[in-house]
């Protein structure tokens, strides 16, 4: 089978394939799942507040924020951004707390990106 000796030229205690001194095998890492943060429409939150949320928490330009806000208004929901799970969860929490603090019913949620 393989040569299980340490490569004398390496500081790493990894076994090398037969006869290939210095070759280190790197495990393939899976790409992390990404999650969409979605803003949900309601009948009370003003459009300018939704734009403010998109600019403040998602670093959107005025034009980008307005486009997403119109999706929320017309389609019932709009994607604010796509993030790793931890970042998406934090964004959802920030948006929901900010809306509640300002006494608006705006809600956000996350959904795994397909």
Curated annotation (Swiss-Prot):
SUPFAM superfamilies referenced in this protein's UniProt entry, alphabetically: ClpS-like (SSF54736)
Alphabetical list of Pfam families matching this protein: ClpS
InterPro entries: ClpS (IPR022935), ClpS_core (IPR003769), Ribosomal_bL12_C/ClpS-like (IPR014719)
Recorded superkingdom: Bacteria
Any GO BP: protein catabolic process
Subunit structure: Binds to the N-terminal domain of the chaperone ClpA.
Similarity-based family: Belongs to the ClpS family.
Function (record text): Involved in the modulation of the specificity of the ClpAP-mediated ATP-dependent protein degradation.
UniProt protein name: ATP-dependent Clp protease adapter protein ClpS
């Amino acid at each position: 089978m393989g040569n299980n000796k340490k490569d004398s030229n390496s500081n790493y205690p990894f076994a090398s394939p037969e006869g290939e001194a210095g070759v280190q095998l790197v495990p393939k890492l899976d790409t992390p799942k990404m999650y969409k943060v979605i803003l949900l429409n309601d009948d009370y939150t003003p459009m300018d507040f939704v734009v403010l949320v998109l600019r403040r928490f998602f670093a959107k330009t005025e034009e980008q924020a307005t486009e997403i806000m119109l999706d929320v208004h017309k389609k019932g929901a709009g994607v604010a951004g796509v993030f790793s799970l931890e970042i998406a969860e934090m964004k959802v929490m920030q948006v929901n707390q900010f809306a509640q603090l300002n006494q608006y019913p705006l809600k956000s949620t996350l959904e795994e990106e397909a």
